[in-house]
């Protein structure tokens, strides 16, 4: 039940706050900035954490082996992997590859 409650709250947040989310960068281009972690979940299949984060009102998605608490801000450098839609709600989301995270 707690997972469903968490997912429902996240869906509502994405629907309201990130409705106007835009893609950042072109595919294959390097990007950098400061992101705030919005959601995370651990995939036991890949043994990695999947993160959804906010960059100036736009959603990004990436994988990382380190656990980062939700709400924490991180500086990042990465390459744009793909442009797509969020899995919970149809808003624009940029998938990143080769992500390096730094302290803010």
Stretches found by the model and what they are:
Residues 2, 8-47, 74-80:
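Structural detector for short beta-strands of small beta-barrel domains
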């Amino acid at each position: 039940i707690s997972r469903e409650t968490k997912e429902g709250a996240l869906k509502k947040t994405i629907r309201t706050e990130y409705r106007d989310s835009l893609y950042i960068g072109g595919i294959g281009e390097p990007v950098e900035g400061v992101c705030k972690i919005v959601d995370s979940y651990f995939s036991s299949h890949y043994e990695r954490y999947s993160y959804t984060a906010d960059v100036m009102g736009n959603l990004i998605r990436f994988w990382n082996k380190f656990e980062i608490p939700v709400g924490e801000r991180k500086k990042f450098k990465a390459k744009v992997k793909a442009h797509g839609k969020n899995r919970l709600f149809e808003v624009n989301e940029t998938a990143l590859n080769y992500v390096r995270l730094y302290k803010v």
